[in-house]
A protein has these predicted regions:
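Glycoside hydrolase catalytic-domain context in secreted enzymes
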Residues: 1-138, 155-376
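Extracellular and select intracellular beta-sandwich modules with Ser/Thr-enriched
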Residues: 139-143
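Short beta-strand edge segments in extracellular beta-sheet folds
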Residues: 144-154
Length: 376
């Protein structure tokens, strides 16, 4: 079965979402019975028994949603905190699924200091209800537990908005309200430390392979390079560079004879999240787009799919795939949503990690892209 990794369409009164997050059809039917089996300082464990009550073998998604107390920060009604996909379950058979959820997965961020812990991820005190099921609406209560105020991670302000605006949040009673965001206290460059300068030594005869073989350090290798060589090292050539595989997106690295003489190869990349784009007549496999992969909620399947893509990259002498796409579906009109996985950051992150892992298994890699601010 496949499930929506986005929510879509309101009813005529625009009060009820017709297709909630996690909604999907199957050729069979399932029952899910769940319970919280352990709560520790940093994680909770939920066990679910999934039974196939239909006539056809199939897989099912078990998603864990958390309803947190509104507290002073305001929370979504429910937030996805973890998920798993069963193996194929025969009719009448069942499978036990155990999901361990780090508490950080449903912590809230306090950017104003209203809790007394500014710039931290934390859990506000109160009762936390845990639900298990496929979609966010039909998921059944697995249990609840009482949580004391707990700071999960203390951070520092780095890049807060420069201008204040109002954002929608909830009061303690759940009422939707608009409140101004806190004013910036530090600029984005205030805390950036300048790196130590490496003294230029000139050509010492070192090759990049000497770093790999631990004969020299990377700093010693870099010290050989002039400013002009360093600039060229980070300069890229666009589509169809003659220095790499024909028809690919860009080349970078060893683009000059001097850099190649140091053992720095010209590195090749190509688009993208829907498979290799080769604008030269070379044929390649087209992949399901990011959103369709997200709808599977199947990390194992995503990893295996990208293992295959990794082999295809190597066959075409491409070093890095320009993907997966990491932007989330903030706006349904975003022109490149097909490249992105979900409106949910957890699904997006886990699916993208599975894809990168699949590429890496066969010695390829990917470039996670459009992490934010690419709403075209």
């Amino acid at each position: 079965s496949a499930k929506l990794c986005v929510s879509a369409a309101m009813d005529e009164d625009e009060t009820v979402i017709q297709y909630p997050f996690g909604f999907g059809l199957s050729y069979t039917a399932f029952e899910i019975a769940s319970a919280i089996t352990d709560v520790t300082e940093n994680a909770i464990t939920v066990e679910a028994v999934v039974k196939n009550t239909g006539d056809t073998a199939g897989k099912e998604v078990v998603a864990i949603y958390v309803e947190a107390p509104q507290g002073m920060l305001g929370k979504p009604s429910r937030v996805l905190a973890g998920f798993a996909k069963t193996q194929v379950i025969a009719p009448g058979e069942e499978e036990k699924v155990t999901i361990v959820i780090p508490k950080k997965a449903y912590a809230s961020y306090d950017d104003s200091g209203v809790t007394g812990h500014k710039d931290s991820f934390l859990l506000e005190a109160g009762s936390y209800k845990i639900y298990a099921g496929a979609d966010v609406r039909s998921a059944a209560l697995a249990g609840s537990y009482e949580q004391e105020l707990q700071v999960i991670e203390q951070l520092e302000e780095a890049c807060a908005p420069s201008e204040q605006f109002e954002r929608m949040t909830r009061d303690a009673d759940g009422t939707l309200v608009y409140k101004k965001i806190p004013a910036r206290e530090f600029g984005p460059y205030d805390r950036i430390e300048k790196p130590e300068e490496i003294a230029y030594t000139g050509d010492k005869g070192y090759k990049l392979a000497d770093v790999y073989n631990k004969k020299i350090t990377m700093d010693e290798f870099i010290a050989q390079l002039s400013d002009e060589q360093l600039i060229m090292l980070f300069h890229a050539e666009g589509m169809c560079s003659p220095k790499v595989t024909a028809g690919t997106a860009c080349a970078f690295g060893g683009l000059t004879e001097e850099l190649r003489a140091l053992g720095i190869p010209a590195t090749c990349t190509t688009d993208g999240p829907s498979g290799l784009r080769m604008d030269c007549g070379t044929k390649a496999f087209s992949l399901p787009n990011g959103t369709l992969i997200g709808c599977t909620f199947d990390l194992e399947l995503a990893q295996k799919l990208y293992e295959m893509t990794g082999y295809e990259l190597r066959r075409n002498r491409v070093d890095s795939l320009l993907g997966p796409g990491m932007n989330i579906h903030r706006n349904p009109l975003n022109g490149r949503n097909f490249e992105y996985i979900s409106e949910d950051p957890l699904v997006t992150g886990k699916m993208a990690a599975a894809q990168i892992k699949g590429l890496g298994i066969v010695g390829s890699t990917g470039t996670i892209k459009h992490f934010a601010t690419n709403n075209q």
